[in-house]
């Protein structure tokens, strides 16, 4: 009996998380939907919505619709690019600190290492 209740609670929790996630995604892009709606209103106001579209009109409409999406992608890519640049710079600085010039040591020189003596 308890196991069945637990399954029900977990199912409800999962369902609520999925629904909240979708609501959050829809709230993040209301501006994009608004732009699409405005573009379609302009098209219907000029009478293009009732006419047959030519290939050029369709291409122009699709390019106008994809502009906000491209801007969103570019923002994401620029942020990803900045983090990638930062990571590469950190790797380079770590590599440069590891590549210290080797010292020229005298023949037969010995250093004490915690496990024993080593040659220089």
From Swiss-Prot:
Biological role: Somatostatin inhibits the release of somatotropin.
Keyword Signal: yes
Native species: Carassius auratus
Region (Disordered): 76-100
GO biological process: regulation of cell migration
Similarity comment text for this entry: Belongs to the somatostatin family.
Gene, per the UniProt record: sst2
Protein name: Somatostatin-2
Compositional bias (Basic and acidic residues): 84-94
């Amino acid at each position: 009996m308890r196991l069945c209740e637990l399954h029900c609670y977990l199912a409800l929790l999962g369902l609520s998380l999925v629904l909240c996630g979708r609501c959050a995604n829809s709230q993040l892009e209301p501006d994009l939907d608004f732009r699409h709606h405005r573009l379609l209103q302009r098209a219907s106001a000029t009478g293009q919505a009732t006419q047959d579209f030519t290939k050029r009109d369709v291409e122009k409409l699709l390019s106008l619709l994809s502009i906000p999406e491209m801007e969103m992608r570019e923002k994401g890519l620029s942020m990803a690019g900045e983090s990638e640049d930062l990571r590469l710079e950190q790797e380079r600085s770590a590599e440069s600190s590891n590549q210290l010039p080797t010292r020229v040591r005298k023949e037969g020189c010995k250093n004490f290492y915690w496990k024993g003596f080593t040659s220089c």
